[in-house]
Amino acid sequence: MTPQFNECAQLTGNMDKAVNALYDCLIANENPLNRMIDMQRQLQIELAQRHPKYNRDPRELKTCGEILDWCQAQDDYIADEIREHYTALGGMSNPKPNAIWKPWRAEHAEYRNRLFSELSPEDQLEAKFELIDQIHFVLNKIIAMGMDGDEIFKLYYLKNAENFARQENGY
C-alpha cells in the first residue's frame, strides 16, 4: 500500500501570494527568515489554543526541561517527515515510491538511479514540500531557543567558518 501524503504540489497555484509576501519582506527590509519564524510561532499559538491537550504555546516554554521535551517532540515529527521525504523522492505518482529506500524491493535500483529531473514537476514539488514540512519543526525548535534570523545567520556563519577551518587542518 502506498503511503498517503498531503498533495502539496497544487499549492503552487497560490505562488503569486508567496512571491508577493517575499517582496513585501524585502521591501520592508525585513529578514524573510524572521517572517517564517513569526508565521510558525503564530501557527503554534493557534494549535495550542485549538488543541491544548496535545500542543503548547511556545511562548510558555521556560525551563530547559520544557525546551528539551519540546525539541524531542519536534525531532519525532521531523523523523516522520524525513521518511515521507524519502518516499516522495521515489515519485509519488509511481506505483511503489518507497522502493527508493527499501533495498528488498525489486524496483530499488531503478528508483535510486532515476534522475530527479526525470520526476514529474508535481512529484518534484511533493519531494520539496516534504522537506519544507521538516523546516516547520526545525523552526519550532528555533522558536523554543528564542532565536531570530539574524542570530541564526551569525551563528551559522561562525560555525561554517569553523567547519572549513577543520577541513583545512585535516579534521
Predicted region positions:
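Flexible "arm" and connector segments at domain edges
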Residues: 1-171
